[in-house]
Amino acid sequence: MSIPIESIKQGLALLPERFTNKAVFRLLVAIGLQESRFTHRYQVVQGKPGAKGPARGFWQFELGSEASRGGVWGVVLHKASRGHLENVCKTLGVPFDARTIWQSLETNDKLATAVARLLLLTDPFEIPKQQGAAW
């Protein structure tokens, strides 16, 4: 396992500076370790080697749906994240389409980092300032 520190920094650099600090970085690392150990870029299906579950990227995002407003769709639709995600997609040359974004998370770590950070913007709770609370 190797934490992709540079990719995380580069992904966060695509967002406004106010969205990045040590607490954000620490929480993204904690979530990535929990979800994929920064080893799996798609959801592993137990007992089915090579089969892909519905989640993509180190932070294991599902596509969700417009109706559920969950997963990638939630970040696409939420007023706190939508404009920032549009900018990130434009910068990275990724079409601003929930399915395309979701598919790209498996291979584009900068995009995956930005989407993971933007999801945190949609949460009403503050990012933990103390290291222990991030775990």
What does each model-found stretch correspond to?
Residues 14-22:
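Helix-loop segments that flank and shape redox-cofactor active sites
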Residues 2-7, 11, 33-125:
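Peptidoglycan-targeting cell-wall enzymes and recognition modules
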Residues 22-30, 132-135:
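Alpha-helical scaffolds flanking conserved acidic
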Residues 125-132:
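Short, solvent-exposed secondary-structure capping/transition elements
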